[in-house]
Amino acid sequence: MAPPETGDELVFFVNGKKVVEKDVDPETTLLTYLRRKLGLCGTKLGCGEGGCGACTVMISKYDPFQKKILHHTANACLFPICALHHVAVTTVEGIGNTKSRLHPAQERIAKSHGSQCGFCTPGIVMSMYTLLRNKPKPKMEDIEDAFQGNLCRCTGYRPILEGYRTFAVDSNCCGKAANGTGCCHSKGENSMNGGCCGGKANGPGCCMNEKENVTMMSSSLFDSSEFQPLDPTQEPIFPPELMTQRNKEQKQVCFKGERVMWIQPTTLQELVALKSQYPNAKLVVGNTEVGIEMRLKNMLYPVILAPAWIPEMNAVQQTETGITFGAACTLSSVEEVLRKAVAELPSYKTEIFQAALEQLRWFAGPQIRNVAALGGNIMTASPISDLNPVLMASGSKLTLISMEGKRTVMMDEKFFTGYRKTIVKPEEVLLSVEIPYSKEGEYFSAFKQAYRREDDIAIVTCGMRVLFQHGTSRVQEVKLSYGGMAPTTILALKTCRELAGRDWNEKLLQDACRLLAGEMDLSPSAPGGMVEFRRTLTLSFFFKFYLTVLQKLSKDQNGPNNLCEPVPPNYISATELFHKDPIASTQLFQEVPRGQLVEDTVGRPLVHLSAAKQACGEAVYCDDIPHYENELYLTLVTSTQAHAKILSIDASEAQSVPGFVCFVSAKDVPGSNITGIANDETVFAEDVVTCVGHIIGAVIADTQEHSRRAAKAVKIKYEELKPIVTIQEAIEQQSFIKPIKRIKKGDVNKGFEESDHILEGEMHIGGQEHFYLETHCTLAVPKGEDGEMELFVSTQNLMKTQEFTASALGVPSNRIVVRVKRMGGGFGGKETRNTILTTVVAVAAFKTGRPVRCMLDRDEDMLISGGRHPFLGRYKVGFMKNGKIKSLEVSYYSNGGNSADLSHGVMDRALLHLDNSYNIPNVSIMGFICKTNLSSNTAFRGFGGPQGMMIAECWMSDLARKCGLPPEEVRKINLYHEGDLTHFNQKLEGFTLRRCWDECLSSSNYHARKKLIEEFNKQNRWKKRGMCIIPTKFGISFTVPFLNQAGALVHVYTDGSVLLTHGGTEMGQGLHTKMIQVASRSLGIPTSKIYISETSTNTVPNTSPTAASVSADINGMAVHNACQTILKRLEPIKQSNLKGSWEDWIKTAYENCISLSATGFYRIPDVGYNFETNKGKPFHYFSYGVACSEVEIDCLTGDHKNIRTDIVMDVGTSLNPAIDIGQIEGAFVQGIGLFTMEELRYSPEGNLYTRGPGMYKIPAFGDIPTEFYVSLLRDCPNSKAIYSSKAVGEPPLFLSASVFYAIKDAIYSAREDSGVTEPFRLDSPATPERIRNACVDTFTKMCPSAEPGTFKPWSVRA
């Protein structure tokens, strides 16, 4: 049946309302339609590739085959609008709102402090809501599994899980608050105990609470009894019209767009005929692969066929030989069928099913599994597919159909013919897949190693099957299939042939590994890199398979018990997977003093004031601002070369794209093209580009889609120049950004002479992508007169945004108004680098005279905006036999990228934190900023401090080994004391670190657990545990003195309501909430009377960036100052009417012509430091903390599990314990990413490979410590900040180094088992590759690395 000349009508429902779309473009995603056409902006764009879950919605449809309504989550960023025909969509706006009532899924995440920046919150809410629709009484495991496809960069996940635990039927496991104080999960060796009162030190029930004038400790951040109950009967009904429609006979529909035609046939005959007519058409079910190809790889498929309605392609049939799945069956439905089969069939028949289920468990996230088809997974022919090795090793059969009829092919070594190619003919359709039952005497396993367990693509994956001759341990047949070892999924044919007929014993293992090492060879330059690691994994996986089978053979009652060797007891754990235990956590904080007024919220765990709006999708972010009628969209044109001369720019082809308006470049800048913190950057590149992603121009068009297409059509010719990419290359070529900083204290040479030992070494710390969920966004609105322009920007730095824009436009700063309501995360990434986008958008708005908007796609944002500086530290440390440090000489090298930006400040802080928390009498340090051809690196939470301290802990760890002393003892004897001078000669006052250290040692039960770890390691050869306790000392202040200032503006209106404005921006850290708490106490009124609308340059001028963790300090003092001014004016009125209310006093003041508006100002006194003289005071005060972490590693794969973390943190007298604990946990988990997971990978030519969540992995829900305990140090007021508080944003991040060094501790145990005892180098992050390669053993020795310099690597370390 040929498609009609005109398109059909698309009919679907959104939040219960019918939508009829007569003009639909198949290239439009559901996300775009929701946001642009329906104005439903609660659904967010986080990545555009289905990797973050910010766009999660619920899809509901009536299944006529099962005769029931099905609800499932999906990623709206990939879901094609055309796939919604006769489907219902529910978005976060459709389940509850702040005007009427919140749904329990919204209320609980808000009130449990699970929303910080809030950008990810709607997606998480919808994942929870969909789970509740399907399972109103879920288990905790169901809840954790539901979030596999959701990411959060702010919270550290713990409060989200705690809030949603209240839905779980197994939450109250022992009749008490689950995992709170007194829960059974918190008892025993792993409880947060120690110290006084039988393990209740510092907590509720501690003897300290009985003392006079001592406030109590609390572990309750929210009261679950206040939550409204879930009532499943009150959920919206499924549209009856859709049930009626699906029961009717369906007809083929067709939708035509500008470039793509979408045809949805209803019968197999129609589909086969269409595939014959359009042999190159793509079949799409979930669009999870094709959608990414079209957006990120610039692919175009003019015809798309959607087989989702065809009964035969959705059918599931159990036969005598296996289960046959229609090719359009989703992975979730396959999972459901296999799980049922495993539960019902004899276990010997389900070996393959069990392995497939294990692979499916970690296959993407639920949002992808719910829509992605089994057939699509096969036909995509990805060489790193999780399922294809299972299907190949199992001997699965595929049925193909075309106009010529059906044929069945085996999924064997002949099926994949090349990269992304199969034997399937263009006109053929994959109809079904048969996964066979396993036989008696047949065993099957599947393995996968990735950077992250949840929602990650494989590095290497495999399926392994062995069939034994009946009644023996002799191999009849073996199939070993690998992904990630070639351009296709492959079988180790030679190895399989050699193993047939052999007995399953140690000799077979040795020969198999030798054969695999030869057969699974890789070129040192192989795409994907990690060659040594990948080769070793092939052997490690087989070893695991060998042990697993051996174990099953010996346990099989009917098997040849006497014919196989038993598995050695210390090897058994190698066969066990890391399992997920329910999270256990406690948060301890000091309650407010007895007698504090109820309306005084300072010190109370007040919920983030935007949390409810964020949970309902009502909070407005930059790209949520309604579109102007004449608005245009901008897409950047960036360099594809790291270093090159621009020979020509040709935008002529772009002009032919529909909707094209203009192209802007350097010649269109009306003011100065020079920009940047150090005036060493340009708005647009002119003659030379100095990094991939360097902005050359921009295309402006009527829609985002048109501007994207036009931007891709711009042609640029280059003359390539040699780039500098790595720190090592910069050192060799002496490419440094001057000046080079130094600090000297004492006599280093004399210190070395007096030392018993001298240790030299180096450590590299990789960079880190900010991965704020909201990418950079700007909306520029020209006002039409005198060069005025209004900018809505996602920025931490209004002043520089205003200044740089004014410079580019050639107008004074007073013509530019910058507004920021909130950001979807920042972490330093929006302190300066937003300006490279904002100035471009402003120039475009100036040229066109119309509003212009741009929100970067995730891949663009990661490419151009820079991140945390990679560091190399080279050290020489002298120390005594007892571990006491005498002398330190260090050189730090950072990779600054192609401009200075904030690199000097980052290096300054690194130099000032080289000591971490240790008193070193003699110090000499130099800091070099490498100028390279990468996008300029910039501020990131910690701002150089974590890198400086990480290198300190590297030599501290190694010297403890050298001395043969416990690391915790060596660390403690080197800790500062009260009154000591740092290496930059600042006196330590109010030094609480030793209190934090002692309490953390006690509460973590450190010494008892250390003995248990030693015992565990003796009993396990291939799994090892490690533990480490790490301190931190973090200086608080901008190191640029003039930035330590802030302003505020307070307006009081005649009804008594207060409008508060200050110079800080809200990015999820709760700054606005804290400022309202400060104003509330200062004015003596409830927080409900105070409101913050936004931060803007026309209310508070010359604002310092919201950075350096000082924003609450400086803005809080400025707010307090403004409030005190108003109170002083009100004092006479209050005295004359002592019984009056606030409203009475305000009305009287107004009638007496007393100003009810006041500005406030504050500057930090007496800060400033001179590197030349090593004199001054760079910091106002210090924040302190200690963390103890325990991990377990898999020595065979490099995988690791975070078992437990205890943190004790000094935050002074907390302004808001919930926000402060949230910052501690969020920073810690972000640090886990920095030190164990997140790795930026570049080509030798400087091209960034890791441009999205597909290849760049931040921690997910399953990566946080299973036991996570945080305690705020009690009774430690800080006289130097507002209401005795302390900064909290950055200081906790470095504590996650405890995880890194716990991993290193575990690796030491593995190496000792191999007879290797000397200190070793472990660079950061401790990825599975580095962990596995460091656990030297027989397998690693069989896969040696190629000699550096003899090959060109696929990737380099910047």
Curated annotation (Swiss-Prot):
Assembly with partners or alone: Homodimer.
Which InterPro entries is this protein grouped with? 2Fe-2S-bd, 2Fe-2S-bd_dom_sf, 2Fe-2S_ferredoxin-like_sf, 2Fe-2S_ferredoxin-type, 2Fe2S_fd_BS, Ald_Oxase/Xan_DH_a/b, Ald_Oxase/Xan_DH_a/b_sf, Ald_Oxase/xanthine_DH-like
Q: Residues that bind [2Fe-2S] cluster 2, according to the entry?
A: 117, 120, 152, 154
- From the UniProt record, which GO molecular function terms apply? 2 iron, 2 sulfur cluster binding; FAD binding; flavin adenine dinucleotide binding; hypoxanthine dehydrogenase activity; iron ion binding; molybdenum ion binding; molybdopterin cofactor binding; xanthine dehydrogenase activity
Species of origin reads Gallus gallus (Chicken)
Q: Which residues bind substrate?
A: 831, 909, 943, 1039
Supply the gene name: XDH
| Entry comment describing in which tissues the protein is expressed | Detected in liver (at protein level).
What's the EC number here? Answer: 1.17.1.4, 1.17.3.2
Q: What class of enzyme is it?
A: oxidoreductase
Taxonomic lineage: Eukaryota, Metazoa, Chordata, Craniata, Vertebrata
Name the record gives this protein: Xanthine dehydrogenase/oxidase
Q: List, for all copies, the residue spans of the domain called 2Fe-2S ferredoxin-type.
A: 8-95
- Name the SUPFAM superfamilies for this protein: 2Fe-2S ferredoxin-like, CO dehydrogenase flavoprotein C-terminal domain-like, CO dehydrogenase ISP C-domain like, CO dehydrogenase molybdoprotein N-domain-like, FAD-binding/transporter-associated domain-like, Molybdenum cofactor-binding domain
